[in-house]
Amino acid sequence: MSRNDQEPFLVKFLKSSDNSECFFKALESIKELQSEDYLQIITDEEALKIRENDKSLYICDRFSGTVFDHLKQLGCRIVGPQVVTFCMRHQQCVPRAEHPVYNMIMSDVTVSCTSLDKDKREEVHKYVQMMGGRVYRDLNVSVTHLIAGEVGSKKYLVAANLKKPILLPSWIKTLWEKSQEKKITKYTDVNMEDFKCPIFLGCIICVTGLNGIHRKTVQQLTAKHGGQYMGQLKMNECTHLIVQEPKGQKYECARRWNVHCVTLQWFHDSIEKGFCQDESIYKAETRVEAKMVPDTSTPTAQSNAESHTLADVSHISNINGSCVNETMFGSTTSKLECSLENLENLDISMFQAPEDLLDGCRIYLCGFSGRKLDKLRRLINSGGGVRFNQLNEDVTHVIVGDYDDDVRQFWSKSSHRPHVVGAKWLLECFTKGYILPEESYIHTNYQPAGIAVSDQPGNQTAVLDKSGSFSKSALVPAERLQQADEDLLAQYGNDDSTMVEAKLSEALEPEVGPCPGSAHREPCDDSTHISVQEENKSSVSHCILDDSTVREEGLFSQKSFLVLGFSVENKCNIVDIIREHAGKIVSLPSRIVADYAVVPLLGCEVDVTVGEVVTNTWLVTCIDNQTLVDPKSNPLFTPVSVMSGVTPLEDCVISFSQCVGAERDSLVFLANHLGASVQEFFVRKANAKKGMLASTHLIVKEPTGSKYEAAKKWSLPAVNISWLLETARIGKRADENHFLVDNAPKQEQVLETKIPNGVSSNPDLPAHPDAHLEIHRKKAVTPLDMNRFQSRAFRAVISQQRGQDPTFPPVRQPLTKEPSLHLDTPSKFLSKDKLFKPSFDVTDALAALETPNAASQKRKLSSPLSEVIVRNLTVALANSSRNTDSHSASPQLKGAHLEEEETRKPLDSVVVCVSKKLSKKQSELNGVAASLGAEYRWSFDETVTHFIYQGRANDSNREYKSAKERGVHIVSEHWLLECAQEYKHLPESLYPHTYNPKMSLDINTVQDGRLCNSRAPLAVSASKDDGPDHLSVEGNETNTMGTNDKESPLLNGSGRDDCKGALTQALEMRENFQKQLQEIMSATCIVKTPAQKTCMSRSSCNSASSTPDSARSVRSGRSRVLEALRQSRQAVPDVNTEPSQNEQIIWDDPTAREERARLASNLQWPSDPTQHSELQVEIKMPDDSPSRKPVYHSEIAEQASCVTQAPGHPGSEEPEPPVAERPLIPEPQAPAVASPLAKPPVAPQPADKIETQEETHRKVKKQYVFQMSSLNSQERIDYCRLIKDLGGSVIEKQCSDPSCTHMVVGYPLRNEKYLASMAAGKWVLHRSYLDACKTAGRFVQEEDYEWGSSSILDALPDVTEHQQKLALAAMRWRKRIQQSQESGIVEGAFSGWKAILRVDRPREAGFKRLLQAGGAKVLSGHPEPLLKDATHLFCDFNKLKPDDCRVFIAEATAQNMVCLKTEYIADYLMLESPPCADNYRVSEAALFHNKKGGPGLPQKRKTPAENVVKRPRVH
């Protein structure tokens, strides 16, 4: 429907069967004004075919239905017929609105909304715009009407003073409904007075101090004008309190609850003026002047009392008189209550202090009675303080009047001493509006003599822990006394930091208690700590400083907080912490919108509006790093969603690594809440004496560290933090395979806290993997944390004694107020004219650091050294040279940068597990496997590829059955030993678990690709630096060109020429070598199938320069194997030597020759096409190629767009030499396809070539059902999301599915999914197809991204010859089957076959699915009628009883059925022409066939033409 630029503007009328009369009037009116050439009348069907916004004007009669929604989604300009008639009548232009316009009833109306919820506001906006009106979110002079949900907002007050109509949302709804019914033509046709906003809408009014008549009048008028009257004052419900006089209980509560306290005049003026008045004008307040004279004529006793200085007061104390600081007493004014005149007559309402002034203060009153006590109680309640009726250790302040002996006894006995102050401190705090330092108001009876408050070590706890007033104190420096009373100082000498640390630890502790069953609950000192560096505060805070300075320059200055969901004690602690860092606390109810709501880790209900909801973990992290951290940078900073009532991790024992600080504490709590047991040490076996359980999971951030290595060694899952969060979210144990830390990209740290100033909560420190930049915390793992010491010299000495390099962490920013207070550092006032050089006696310091828990803290995190020497020395040596760089999963270009790579070992991709039956040899066999590059497992798991077992053919051993069901290789121990002796990856089928070397045939002459793929080095060139590129021709699966490890990373022009010459030379060498091998094969007496000859012709030996390995690990037993392993590395065989030259010349034994032929045919390819074949180690993945280069999937798409696809033989094309000009940009680790598409496509964009409507319709209905194979888990997740976003579906099965239409594979493998897709003629695509779909935003054409197309194979230099055959075969079958389907014949690759399967049961289902995918009919059972109908019999008698096999084959041969090996199925698909069936005939069937056709047996014999297996009718 697109039009040319010269085409004029079109008006399209959408015609339907129920068009109204107005529709036809509009059509006639436009016809009178404009030519019919510019008018179009379209139907609903034509409208649905529109695929883009063609800038036309659409006239729709109904603003609902499928057609309207379709045009609206395309962004078309839509108006109703009433708009056309209105514009014609008034000679106006049709409005150019981005939204549909139904009529013009509100054409000159501009609306703004206030006090409406989001859904209601959006509904009002939609209706106004559809009726031709305009909408402004802000109130300005253009607004004509205000739509209000309730009164009292700023918009409401401004609009009311400007005399603008303030209406209800129902006015808009009524206009829309009446316009639909064609009852109105203008908004003025509806009476606005009926929809005027009531004066007190949304107000809940309560009164106090009014008489009965006035109260009754207020109640009636409130209900009449839309308000609600309430007799009782209720918190969070009442909005206004009408006050006669500003006093009374209701008034006090209303002020505390932020209820508007207004006079009665406010009520009457609101009714008189017609709108709710501003409450601030009518605020009920007390007079400023306070009554200082009693109401009665009788004077009080204290009114005439004289003030005395403390020097004039005689007081006897039990404190040593020599410790009295006379200077302090002489300069201090009276603190006694005698100076507080008229406390009984004090008017509390005169104070204008904030309602949360005393928040966090727990106050005990003593020595007061009567009206004084009542006044102080009311004062404390109005300030938000907590009053205690009994004196205990939770009290932070004691306000004393008369002397109280109970307080004195508590003071002398308790180690926790609250501030004992007079009532004047409380009154002056209310007068100034903030908490004043208590030191100046401490009662003389309860003040330690001679020790300034700032210098008391023990008092730091009280100062910081209780009121947070330490940083606000106006401290007076005093001379420190040389000697004091020993008994008194003993109370303060305990410099135990745990008292200080306990507070923030309690604040961090979530509200849910510890779960039972936890193996090890984290101790208190492993929670969030405040460092002992806080002691320095007393020495740097000797300046008199105003409170406002601290509040303005603190961490949380100008930030408001709302604390919800915590217990009273924890809430008080958190409030103190926030206030200490200049934050403001918002109490409920309040109209202030807090910046942050601090809630527990598991969250709580937040029913008020706040900026962001954060957890206490975020709060502690901000304090640790002294900066405001982004709450979105870590999922623990916001409430974690947890399914309640379930504990999915009850049987799990979890250990954490690389998690420190508040993050670790939160994760430990979360794990305990989910039922898991958390323990510090990561152990494999339980130890009841030490209270340790066997670990089941390790949660780690990065795949490094001793715990991670132990997890890999023990085959325990090492997952990231996301696993724990996902388990909490879904309420069941998440799949660990999706969250393995190995699968996560290195550059992506999901839970790493990103700090703006560069301080990270998890810095990467290789020397100290557990080091963490935090101030208030000790490490939980490291027994002796060097980073806790400030002295670099001290840390250096400790490092030398521990045998480590003195690696110092980055400079840390301590949590102190010095930067904001602009104070000098301690070094400046310790001594101004001397350089401070501390010296340490390291011996004494280290001895002092020893604690009773040191022994338990120094437990080894790994196995004993003796065990490592005995079992793992070879493993360490093998792993030390292993290349750990992870390759991209995408095809990569040839580049000039060549990385040095160690020679790969024979069993690099193998994971072995030794049966418990061979437990005595397990350590020895594991060592042999590790020396060959294989990994080993102590217990069988899903990662094992080879199970080493020795037993009978049909053994009933449980381990054997499990391994057999998994489909892994079950081999004899001799296979591993022979691999070590030959230093080759020998075929597994030659060494079954029943293998007995004394009863086995000599099969050294039978070699397939893996035998020749020897890792033993061959010296092709003696030059190490300047020689030509080495030729590396792998076996039947590898055809890659390796380059010299010492080659220059950049290729200039001459380098390219040399490369081309070397490449040509290498090809010639390979060709000559293949000819030699063919001659050798033809000369031998062994009968080989053509497929085997092809395999042997491709075989070659790996050539690379190497040197013998040094020092193998010492092992007991089988030294012959290790000695042979060393000698095999030094041996340099001749390239031109035939494989059988080293054998003795013997006579030709026909039976032995036949057995060798049978074994050689088994070596050709594994006969199991099921999903387990993906684990076959003989399939060499492209990652093994040493010349792997990065390539972009987008480059493949670009190449595919400009390549004319022409079928050609892959063997005729020469490999492309490396191109230096190609950009060497590495590909990302994983495809970034997780983000949803910006605009989901409505339909695919039109193709370049012209298509008929029928083709387009068929294209739209094309199904996209995907399956994936040989992709890693992250790619599967990302691609699944992309496919679903594009409208396709994904089948996540491990086996093939007939409903699949597209198969996306990483690399072609001879497995069930790939072969079944090939047999069914389905699309077999490269992963770059999905990347191209993501770029285009739709499913694109598949031809250029199909495996086998030149655009894919040319861009993938490391595709082996075997993979290339598979790719070309898939494309060939797809074209054949599609051509037959287009001609009306629905067939597959096996159409016409009627097959019977005689294979072992675990593999039968895979073969059945494969045959059925290709159109074959699989017959079950073997009755004689079925044998008559069947055409093929596929047998694999290795695991079946020989007697049954012979009987069955005899019956099948009698019915002239073709009895073939299962390998025939895969080769039938792969080869261009059908393979010869005789080469795959079962040997037993051949014997019966010969007997049957012998002389004297006149039975029917097939002609040679009939002996060939039928080819299906697919051309």
From Swiss-Prot:
Region entry Disordered, spans: 799-826, 880-901, 1020-1055, 1097-1119, 1203-1255, 1491-1515
Gene Ontology CC entries for this record: actin cytoskeleton; BRCA1-B complex; centrosome; chromosome; condensed nuclear chromosome; cytoplasm; male germ cell nucleus; nucleus
PTM entry text: Phosphorylated on serine and threonine residues in response to X-ray irradiation.
SMART domains reported in the protein's UniProt record: BRCT
GO molecular function, one term: phosphorylation-dependent protein binding
Intervals of motif Nuclear localization signal: 1510-1513
Known tissue expression: Highly expressed in testis.
Residues annotated as domain BRCT: 101-189, 195-284, 353-443, 551-636, 644-741, 902-993, 1255-1347
Basic and acidic residues bias spans: 1023-1032
Keywords: Chromosome, Cytoplasm, Cytoskeleton, DNA damage, DNA repair, DNA-binding, Nucleus, Phosphoprotein, Repeat, Ubl conjugation
Pfam family, one: BRCT_TopB1_SLF1
Effect of S1420P: In strain: FVB/N
Low complexity bias locations: 1097-1116
Modified residues (Phosphothreonine): T298, T782, T851, T1064
Record carries keyword Zinc: no
SUPFAM superfamilies tied to this protein: BRCT domain
Complexes and interactors: Interacts (via BRCT domains 1 and 2) with (phosphorylated) MDC1; promoting TOPBP1 recruitment to DNA damage sites during mitosis. Interacts (via BRCT domains 7 and 8) with (autophosphorylated) ATR; promoting activation of ATR. Interacts (via BRCT domains 7 and 8) with (phosphorylated) POLQ; specifically binds POLQ phosphorylated by PLK1, promoting POLQ recruitment to DNA damage sites. Interacts (via BRCT domains 1 and 2) with (phosphorylated) RAD9A. Interacts (via BRCT domain 2) with (phosphorylated) TP53BP1. Interacts (via BRCT domain 2) with (phosphorylated) HTATSF1.
Entry remark concerning the domains of this protein: Some BRCT domains specifically recognize and bind phosphoserine/phosphothreonine marks on proteins. BRCT domains 1 and 2 bind phosphorylated MDC1 and RAD9A. BRCT domain 2 binds phosphorylated HTATSF1 and TP53BP1. BRCT domains 7 and 8 bind phosphorylated ATR, POLQ and RAD51.
Family: Belongs to the TOPBP1 family.
Identification of the protein by name: DNA topoisomerase 2-binding protein 1
Organism the protein comes from: Mus musculus (Mouse)
Designated gene of the protein: Topbp1
